[in-house]
Amino acid sequence: PGSKHTSSDLAWLRQQGLDAAITRHAQQGRPVLGICGGLQMLGEALIDTHGIDGNAPGLGLLPLVTQFEPDKKMTRTVATFGRVREGAWSSLSGVKALGYEIHHGQTQAHPAMLAAGAVLHEVVPGLAWQSGDGQVLGTYLHGLFENPAVLQAMFGAQVPTLETVFDGLADYIERHFEPGTLAALTAPD
């Protein structure tokens, strides 16, 4: 998931040996998802010319480079996934998701790696990228798994919205409690 200090957190991952475990997992053809700082870590390099969190080599699972910027991007975002390559994430093709971005930096394709034949698929322009084999996906979109459409696409189950859950709870309370009971239970002594 996300990280407030991407380069520092990546150094911690390396100290724990988790970088090798993530890379091995991807090399075995298993799915990897990076969100926000996780997306930045999946790239080739983190470049910090403003002294925000330091330069660092990435995990190298996506041919991307992130350049940290002093201004933080904070915005609600609605994104529709384009064609997602075959693999663990292909069910997201065409799915609309609501979320938010909150990050320092801009991420883009690593031009030298693309020139050398690396494959990168941009599934949401400027927001989500996928590896050539389809198993590694990185996105800036926080809240991905709070979207019923995303959960439906990925896991095939009807997932109720939070609003539906709260409506059900309210109905239950109305049926089983006398008016004023909850207010009396929560009133200060």
Residue map of PLM features:
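Short beta-strand segments
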Residues: P1, H103, Y140
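Feature representing long, continuous alpha-helical segments
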Residues: A20, L33, Q40, P57, ...
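Catalytic beta-strand/loop cores that center a nucleophilic Ser/Cys/Thr
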Residues: R85-G134
